[in-house]
Amino acid sequence: GLREVTGAIHTEGAAAGIQIGHCGNMSHKKICGTTPISASTGFNLYSPTFVRGMKKEELPEMARAYGRAVHLAREAGFDAVEVHAGHGYLISQFLSPYTNHRKDEYGGSLDNRMRFMRMCLEEVMNAAAATGTSVLVKHNMYDGFKGGIEIPESIEIAREIERWKVNGIVLSGGFVSKAPMAVMRGLIPIYTMSYYSPLWLRAFIRYCGPFMIRQFPFSECYFLEDAKKFREALQLPLIYVGVPLKSGSIFFKVSHSPAPASPFCERLI
């Protein structure tokens, strides 16, 4: 199946990439068959579910799974992988002090909270070197709420990612279980967010969600000013996550126009 997809992409002269990651606490026992895992034990209201903090001895095997995912992606014909280390999924749950309350060497200081990410990147980069696969990392510029990762700390994480010689960092932001609108912006899609929830939770979200979920007003290119700070701090290629302008036609326009002269943008695709 996937080989057919990548084959068709290659036939048209393009390269194919796929995102790899683990959702951590953004799962549910009905989906994964067991209590979801995370950096620390707790409760995720978004799912909703109780989650189990991973044991120290489980972490190396989880990191190796990221490496195996690179091999599987290559076997399926993909030229690149994007390691998801943002948006409040598993690697992000280790990085963020909001979800990482560990007392061992994987929690506490930023250096400790980056330890699991480093383990995963080591496995990914070894697999990438063996298979000739390019590697991108999706990274949070900020979590979007008090008590989460802010830009200064995030830049330090990005510098650590850069040290692993990845091909580029995809800059994004937001934490799905706490500040989902930091990613999407604008009106909160309450009915869509609660569609698959149990009846009791659906009612709770629809009545209380607008008061509990932080709003982030929409503005065009809303990540751009923060992304510039990362451009100043890093040397590797950065991919800016954008959205259509209000006209809804920016992607068509830029694909047929030369990139604007800019000190931080090399090209638009």
Predicted features, each with a name:
Residues 1-269:
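Flavin-dependent oxidoreductase catalytic cores
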